[in-house]
Amino acid sequence: MKKIKIAFLLVATVLSSTLVSAQGTKEYTVDGIKVIHKYVPKDVISVRLFVEGGTANYSKEKQGIENLTLNLMVDGGTTNMPKLDFKTASEKIGTSFGASTALDYGSISMTCIKAFWDQSWNLFSDAILNPAFSENEYNLLKEQLIANAQQTMADPDGSLDLLARQIAFENKDYAKAYDGTPESLAGISLEDVKNYYKKTLGKKRTFLVVVGNITEEDLTAKIKASLG
């Protein structure tokens, strides 16, 4: 039931809140990876890898580790392509990548056009399977996220939201700051990030949602060749 709820939220983010129940949405499994696939005859393709668990995946001391890990995966280069090369390759074909976290889930997303689907998928799967996790990019991103957390704490609305959850869900997972606090982020090492990636980014905790002008056969072949 929880998976269905999460899937609904994800697809709603990609298109609209009515998409899940629309005709043409399929659910299937490819080499142990759950796939939710919606075919639409448009040139824009949206892909998102969902990581289940959210705040339940880490301790209070490691708040923000999922945020740091996922963003480093999409914005820190891979073992095959340094950050600048990866960014240049994606910008050249108009493909965008993103990462986000929430109370119950985290995700890595990609949006591309049909003409560059093959190249975009290769970049997407490379970011998921072969993140570089370089110390330099880790330090740069960590400093940025700490600055963001400090700004959130200084903002009345941002700090009020966290305080309300801490009171309502005292000693529960929902009381955690999924973006991290300045203190928790400062205490997360690069080794922590690598270990979190190995522990969390597996088939049991993830599933894929794809919306666009691609066939089940094409998507299945790509998953088997890369993520499977």
Residue ranges and their predicted role:
Residues 1-5, 88-228:
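Charge-rich, well-structured scaffold segments of protease-associated domains
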Residues 7-18:
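Bacterial N-terminal signal peptides
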Residues 20-24:
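Boundary at the C-terminal end of the N-terminal hydrophobic targeting segment
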Residues 25, 33-35, 206:
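Short, conserved active-site loop motifs that form the nucleotide-linked donor/cofactor pocket
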Residues 29-55:
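N-terminal targeting signals for Sec/Tat export/insertion, comprising classic cleavable signal peptides
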Residues 42-43, 55-57, 79, 114-117, ...:
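Solvent-exposed loop/turn segments at secondary-structure junctions
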Residues 48-111, 177-178:
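M16/MPP (pitrilysin/insulinase) zinc-metallopeptidase core fold and M16-derived inactive scaffolds
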